[in-house]
């Protein structure tokens, strides 16, 4: 039984490093063009080079997303893009469009191509066709069940890898192919600029009664009729593995480093726990609780156990659940004194009970007994943005460890 790859989002160089530090086997990133995430910080050429070195030095992989649905005006620029990224050493490029796929095969035949979920990979015949053209992996559409994926795996070539989303936001449209944003805001979702109108509040208007807004659902705020819950499959690692998925993908290139650290860490531990003893494996609910400590919508298993029902949507609000705040990030740690140097992110005080998450280790809880500013003067509260503070911690930490506090 092959251990699947844990694939994490890297919306910036910092997030790429965080994902790798917290246990990702591979990270997918976007450049400043063609990557379908305008809202992400994305990578300059210099960032790409540094990120690739950071990953490869640690035996990890980096995939480059180039999965927009291009117009004629994009083609010449894409050729320049290929020539620029070709020598960098990416482990694969994600493509959704057949024309861009053909250009990649012609101009950089040595770079593996993964076919993006934007290509609606929902049946095995499509996958076989992509494989014949040279694809090494297809990213499955989110609209597939475990049963369908297992059948898919059986009917495709053994060397064709399967990647599937296991956690994160769900699009109401078919694997991200949506024109609501284009129609309502002029922002092209298939060029990476989606305004997420599926999360907006809607009411009903009857043609002969202009100006009379009626609730679609019995709620004074209207209803959020397109508003999906977030995907979460951490309770189903055995099913994910047994269905034949090669790479388990976490959504979220526009999420924070804290989000990436928490989600990657939880899935890393649960995957490793399963493979340590598959026969006697039982799910550790503490990891689900960990996933609830980031900003998220209520969770669902999506299509994995069949078509979603009314319980897969959130009808009354598009707000996130935010029960914890990131309050600081460890920059360095002195093992002799037990003192951590921390960059403050959110206000916290002496006497607060906090949790500290660490790369590849369990989190721990402690009380802030004392802290000083960078000059060594004792302080009662860390309330200045990006303030450097020093604090004794009760267990060893490393650079990149994060402090959080329940609201």
Task: Give residue spans per PLM region.
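Surface-exposed amphipathic alpha-helical tracts and adjacent flexible/coil segments at the periphery
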Residues: 1-22, 26-29, 33, 51-52, ...
């Amino acid at each position: 039984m092959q251990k699947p790859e844990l694939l994490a989002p890297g919306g910036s160089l910092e997030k790429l490093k965080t994902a790798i530090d917290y246990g990702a086997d591979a990270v997918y990133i976007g450049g400043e063009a063609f990557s379908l995430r305008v809202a992400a910080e994305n990578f300059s050429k210099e960032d790409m080079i540094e990120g690739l070195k950071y990953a490869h030095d640690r035996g990890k992989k980096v995939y480059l997303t180039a999965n927009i649905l291009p117009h004629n005006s994009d083609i010449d620029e894409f050729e320049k893009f290929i020539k620029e990224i070709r020598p960098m050493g990416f482990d694969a490029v994600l493509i959704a469009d057949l024309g861009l796929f053909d250009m990649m095969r012609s101009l950089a035949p040595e770079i593996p191509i993964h076919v993006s979920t934007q290509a609606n990979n929902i049946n095995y015949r499509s996958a076989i066709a992509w494989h014949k053209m040279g694809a090494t992996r297809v990213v499955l559409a989110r609209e597939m069940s475990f049963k369908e994926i297992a059948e898919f795996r059986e009917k495709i070539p053994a060397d064709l890898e399967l990647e599937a989303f296991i956690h994160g936001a769900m699009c109401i449209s078919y694997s991200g192919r949506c024109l609501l944003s284009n129609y309502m805001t002029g922002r092209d979702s298939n060029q990476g600029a989606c305004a997420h109108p599926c999360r907006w509040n809607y009411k009903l208007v009857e043609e002969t009664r202009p100006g009379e807004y009626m609730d679609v659902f019995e709620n004074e705020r209207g209803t959020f009729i397109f508003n999906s819950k977030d995907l979460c499959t951490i309770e189903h690692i055995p099913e994910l593995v047994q269905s034949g998925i090669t790479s388990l993908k976490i959504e979220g290139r526009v999420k924070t480093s804290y989000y990436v650290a928490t989600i990657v860490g939880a899935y890393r531990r649960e995957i490793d726990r399963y493979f340590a003893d598959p026969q006697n494996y039982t799910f550790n609910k503490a990891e689900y609780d960990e996933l609830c400590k980031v900003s998220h919508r209520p969770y669902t298993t999506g299509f994995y156990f069949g078509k979603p029902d009314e319980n897969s949507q959130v009808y009354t609000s598009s707000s996130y659940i935010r029960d914890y705040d990131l309050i600081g990030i460890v920059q360095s740690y002195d093992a002799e004194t037990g003192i951590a140097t921390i960059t403050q992110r959110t206000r916290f005080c002496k006497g607060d009970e906090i949790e500290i998450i660490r790369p590849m280790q369990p989190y721990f809880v402690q009380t802030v007994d004392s802290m000083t500013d960078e000059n060594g003067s004792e302080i009662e509260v860390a309330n200045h943005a990006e303030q450097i503070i020093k604090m004794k911690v009760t267990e060893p930490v490393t650079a990149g460890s994060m402090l959080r506090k329940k609201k």
